[in-house]
């Protein structure tokens, strides 16, 4: 949220989600509801240890939505044939996700498709109209967040699909 900045580190996101469960303004039902915590796994490729421990603790009372290397991957999946045209031919570069200036490789791929800054321009939300394309294409990727090191990974579409298919029982 606007008032909660600099908490993008996965461990901090999980702690933030846990704290929000006690926020009376959101009426979180601890018996029925779960927080969905979205984070990038690229930080665990080289810099940060204990990914497995973090996932195990985070999954206890939450749903973890993970992208490797970054959320821009999920956004890229909203474009028809982006898996075949953009992701598959660039697999190695996507996983390395090196920076050119301040921009990562996956960010640049998405920028090439959208022409907009996905981190600052709210028009990126228009991609939601193509979420079914993203869900379909995501199935061609690794969706197992327990085995994502060195693999292009995304499970956000599968979470959306499971929410859509939830009959509430």
What are these regions (language model features)?
Residues 1-32:
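Acidic, glycine-rich catalytic loops of TOPRIM or P-loop NTPase phosphate-binding modules used
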């Amino acid at each position: 949220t606007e008032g909660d900045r600099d908490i993008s580190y996965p461990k901090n996101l999980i702690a933030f989600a846990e704290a929000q469960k006690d926020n009376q303004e959101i009426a979180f039902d601890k018996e029925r509801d779960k927080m969905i915590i979205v984070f990038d796994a690229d930080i665990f490729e080289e810099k940060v240890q204990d990914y497995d421990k973090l996932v195990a603790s985070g999954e206890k009372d939450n749903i973890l939505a993970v992208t490797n290397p970054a959320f821009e991957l999920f956004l890229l999946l909203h474009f028809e044939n982006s898996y075949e045209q953009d992701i598959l031919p660039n697999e190695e570069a996507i996983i390395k996700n090196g920076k050119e200036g301040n921009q990562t490789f996956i960010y640049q791929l998405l920028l090439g498709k959208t022409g907009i800054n996905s981190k600052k321009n709210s028009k990126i939300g228009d991609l939601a109209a193509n979420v079914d394309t993203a869900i379909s294409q995501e199935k061609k990727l690794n969706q197992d967040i327990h085995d994502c090191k060195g693999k292009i990974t995304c499970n956000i579409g599968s979470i959306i699909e499971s929410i859509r298919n939830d009959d509430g029982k």
